[in-house]
Amino acid sequence: MRKLVLFTLLLILPALTMRPLTQTAAAPHSDLEEKSICLTFDDGPTDSTTPHILDILKSENVKATFFVIGKQVRSREEILRREYEEGHRIAIHTYSHEYKAIYTSEETLRSDILQCRKAILKVLPAWNCDLYRFPGGSWGIRDELKETVKKMKLRAVDWNASAEDAVNPAATADKLFDYVLSSAGNRKHIVLLMHDGVGYKATVQALPKIIQYFREKGYKFQLL
């Protein structure tokens, strides 16, 4: 019996330790010979963070993709409108960001997505985008839930580099910059995860340095 338990652990432990720090992502639309990076921001819009992110992006002439929380659009319609009018891509993230409510069933996931879509369309009637990001990423999401997203004609997009700002809320801007570099590695096509939720001051502070670094390395900034 002891040998059987040991053998089982030897099979399971490698699978647990090999879980990636960042999720896989399809390469952005780009010439395969050209290095590219897509900046993506989850969990906005917010009053405290999103406008500062937009100011920096405008100053640097860089476009980004914002994965929106639908319930946060109310009272922040002008921020969402600004994202759209300044040429950024607005995509569906979630309405509530409450994992238990979202992932209970195919119907609860579908309802959450539709509510988010409705909140965006109420502000931007001409908006159209087929991108979706699972709250927490698609790692470990049940197959039937992934299929629900496909049936809704949406493309689920994860990431392959991250500032780790959501899991390290006390990190300094320099530390977030280090996380970005270590997770991006030498990838030719990068989809970078950051957040514009409440309290992401260090993300705002790190963003100019992140943009400068990848620009100097010859990366082209693209929308998803």
Segments predicted by a language model, with ranges:
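Catalytic domains of cell-wall/extracellular-matrix polysaccharide-remodeling enzymes
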Residues: 52, 97-193, 197-215, 219-220
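C-terminal domain-boundary segment and adjacent tail
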Residues: 28-32, 59-61, 71-74, 199-224
